[in-house]
Amino acid sequence: MRTRDTTLLTPWIISFWVQTSALFASFHNQNRLSASSTGANDRLIGIVGDRRIMSEPSPIAPAEGKLGILTPGMGAVATTFIAGVLAARKGYAAPTGSLTQQSHIRLGKRDEHRNPLIKDFVPLASLDDLEFGGWDPYSDDAYAAAMKAGVLEPRHIEGIGEELRMIKPMPAVFSPRWVRNLDGTDQVKPETTHVDQATALMEDIDRFRADKQVDRVVAVWCGSTEAYEEPSDVHIDLDVFEQGLKNNDEAITPSQIYAYACLKMGVPFANGAPNLIVDIPAMVELASREGVPIAGKDFKTGQTLMKTMIAPGLKARMLGINGWFSTNILGNRDGEVLDDPESFRSKEVSKLGVLEHILQPDVYPELYGDIYHKVRINYYPPKGDDKEGWDHIDIFGWLGYPMQIKLDFLCKDSILAAPLVLDLALFMDLATRAGKSGIQEWLSFYFKSPQHAESIHPENDLFIQLTKLKNNLRHMMGEDLITHLGTEYYDES
């Protein structure tokens, strides 16, 4: 019997084993790539230095024709987003804060110096090809709504005033049971049953497609925070949910009716609020059945954005935390809605969950096992959209000596949220054309409470989220994934 001499293979095997071991250690500590970040069916075919080489992805359909963006809710966030895109199209202002428009992405090895803009690397819809629509319980057109919101100065709105006036919201599915503290709503759909409301929304989507002559449509929730709700029996699976629509089940919310209508019409849906929407089993099932992407939830903008920057740094240096007190002052419509205790509860749950998964108190009980974490939101009308987020953090270091961090972030809530709406719309459209469906965890970068598979915890570290997002883009385009191992620059062979 002939035997094969494997002597020449031994160095290669050892090298491959060493690099693989180092790679997995690196992933565990810093670049934990879940199945959703590379695709559950992707096959690892090799590792070269700090690059993870995967099997070829599916082709991406080109971004031909127009993309329609529907926003349930056309208040401060939606109109700031729309006005910003229109201004950028005319060259009046830059789309600052948008990864799709301004961020570069590294490709290959560092010494190759390949760093294209994301929008030049992946086939995204052009800003010139976007059309806008949406629903709102107030009948103000986008111009009037933007002026009332007071986010943008009139001089920034007037140059695009004609286009804004042409964007009129469709009558909304709305219930004061789920969104309180809003008075004077003047265009609510007359349909009284859930199934009729869903049908009316689907007809709206069809009409929007025809009127705007768009080839594709995505939806991004920009509406108000609904009262807190735990999943109930009607949310367990799609058949039960659809029966609940027919029976007018009181546990089905307006936002869930929007999501159902969109997914049934093949429209990807991203949830920018803490509402229970596409993160119920029934919607996950529907998205999978229809082959439509979903993502959520709750735009990560002001105070929570800062938390997901600061907490990873403290953890990286193994600095302990005794307490983290956060308070917010804001005076826009969002603040008015959140002045209701039940709506605030939805936001509180979303904001409180961030630190736990970053700090891992079960792994580091001596550092983070006894944190006192409190979040407060205060409605103060004079603030308008100029939100103030104040954080007091009690930390401890070497030998347990105490220290403090105080952060006062004076931000404009809608200015931070608007580029997220743009990026999510373009990336959800990209995901659709790339054949992706169901939960898009790679978009967790944009959310306070990222939607994820039931078997894993969410990833809230902003920097790991960005690595996940960019590696997904690299994989879509057949580029090597970046692991930051970097050993190939120091090989002594």
Model segments located where?
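Residue-identity detector for glycine
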Residues: G39, G46-G49
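Glycine-rich, aromatic-lined ligand/substrate-binding cores of catalytic
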Residues: S350-G353, H357-E441
